[in-house]
Amino acid sequence: LMIVMGMGGIYRGLIHEAILLVDRVGADLWVVQGNTRGPFAEISRIPGNLENRVRSVQGVAGARRFVSHTIQREQSGKALRIVVEGLAWPEDRGDWVPLLSGRSLRQAHYEMIADVSLNLALGEKITLGKDRYEVVGLTSGMVGTSGDGLAFFTVSDALAIQFDVPGEAVRLERAARRARVENSELGRLQPLLLDRAVGSARGIPALPAPLVSAVLVTLQPGADVSAVRATLGTWPDVTVYSTKEQKDMLLDGMVDKARRQIGLFRVLLIFISTIIIALIIYTLT
C-alpha cells in the first residue's frame, strides 16, 4: 500500500514539473511556429520581430520573445544538463522566478538564474559557448519535463548558447559563402560584396536574425481573448495556443507515456497487494 501511495506521489510530481514553467511564466496566449505544438512539445522557430506584429493587435498589452532548449556540458568532470530559458530582457528580467538567494537579471549579457539542482553556487561562473556566465540568482523546484534543472538567461544570451559553433566551422562557412559569391554574376559585377560575404552573418542584410521559440502574449484587462486569438489565428505563419492548451499538450504528450506506465504499475501492485492481504486474512482465520 505504501508503494502504491508512493507511485501516486511520483505521478503528481511529474504533472507538477511538466506544467510548472507554463504556470509561472504568466502568459495568456502562446504564439508558436505554424502547425507545431509549441516550444515544449517540439521544435518551434519564429522570427523575433514577430513580437512587434503581436503588439499591434487590439487588446494586447504586451508581447515578449521566449527561447527554450536543452544543452549538455561538462562541469567539474561531470555531465551537466541544463534547460536554457531565454527571457525578453529588459521587459522580462525574471522577477517572477521564485528566488532562494541572489537577484534577478540586471544586465543584458553574461548573467543567469539557476535551479539548485544544477549544483551551481551563487556567484559561480561557468563557460557556455564562447562566453562566461555568472550565477546571480538561485531558485528551487524549477525543472523541465525530463527533470533537468532550468537556467534563465536573456534571449540574446540563450540564442548565443544555442547557435554557438567552433571557430573552424565559422571560418569554413565564411569561405564557402565567399566561394558562392565569387561564382555568381553578382560577385563579378560587385567585387566589394566579397568582403561583406566573409564578414559576420549579422552584417549581411539578406540573412535573417536567429529565430526564437515563441512569443508570449499578455492581454489587457477585460480584453476579449477569443477576439485576440481569432485575429492572431488569421496569420498563416503561426499557431496560437492558450495556457490551458499548452498544459494539456504537455500532459497528453510528454507526460502521457510515463502516466500510463505508472498507472500500470499501480494496478499490478494493488492486485498483488490484494492477493497477499487476502491470503494473510485467510491464514489467520
Question: Where are the language model's segments positioned?
Answer:
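Juxtamembrane alpha-helical signal-transduction segment immediately C-terminal to a transmembrane helix
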Residues: 7-10, 14, 18-21, 254-257, ...
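Hydrophobic, regular-secondary-structure patches
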Residues: 2-83, 103, 107-108, 120-122, ...
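Hydrophobic alpha-helical membrane-associated segments
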Residues: 2-10, 272-277, 281
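Peri-transmembrane interface segments
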Residues: 216, 224-275, 282-284
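Structural beta->alpha junctions
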Residues: 35-40, 140-142, 216-224
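Structured catalytic cores of enzymes that bind and process phosphorylated ligands/cofactors
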Residues: 9, 22-24, 87-97, 105-106, ...
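A short beta-strand structural signal in non-transmembrane regions
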Residues: 29, 168-188, 199-235
